[in-house]
Amino acid sequence: SMGVQSFEASTLTKLGRGHDGDTAVRAFEAARAAGFDNVSMDFIYGVQGQTVEQVRRDAEAAAALGSEHLSAYALTLDAESLAEEVPLARQLARGEVTLPPDDVVVAMQRVVRDVYRQAGLERYEVSNYARPGFHSRHNSAYWTGGDWLALGVGATGSVGQARYANVRSAEKYLVEVEAGKLPEQSRETLSALERFEERVAMGLRLASGLDLEATCAAFGQPFDARRPFVERLVAEGLAVREGRRLRLTDEGLDVHSAISARLM
């Protein structure tokens, strides 16, 4: 999996990345030459100063390389999750970052979707596209409520009701491990409501959706109170019911966060 982010020099500069587009292409070609037949690339859109046309060029260039899996994420900025030494973090702290308006970001998302779909890549999750048989098995654990282990500096893990994160200092991580200790920085136990909210938000990211009635029942939440909103989503073309499953349409996936918040 390659964190390309963009082939455009101006976008990479804004993100504080040290590579350029040609370097990313050469890295992809090197992976192919080494025998890798499953290469994934990640991209970011919604960057300050970025245009819809630049996003289109990125998507077309990525599709032309023939990658089996492509991810495209809208940029979100969280000062707490950005390392202090990252240029973007310093700019954010100084109030120098202005992201594109929401309607432009949605237009970027739709351009990516259309370009990838024309190239034979299926949108199987809000931000992820793949050729048949190449869906991300790792990320599916996040979207379907599975467990995963935190291995490495700053990694996060989830086992049952517990969520935990490792220390973000490599030096401290090594000290803890060599002392036979778990290098955890924090741990919390999620309530049934928190797990329900997470399950709904993550499950609706998938193009296949989720069984909302069963999810409500599993976590003690009333489905009937949500039924009118579900019916409204279907009537407005933002979702469809397939048996017991509720899945969002392309238009619904574009506003996934707002829909999930209402259902929670």
Name what the model sees in each region.
Residues 245-249:
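Minor-groove-contacting beta-hairpin "wing" of winged helix-turn-helix DNA-binding domains
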Residues 234-244:
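A short, conserved structural fragment
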Residues 251-264:
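Short, amphipathic alpha-helical interaction segments positioned at domain boundaries
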Residues 220-235:
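Short amphipathic alpha-helical interaction segments
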Residues 1-221:
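C-terminal scaffold of the Radical SAM
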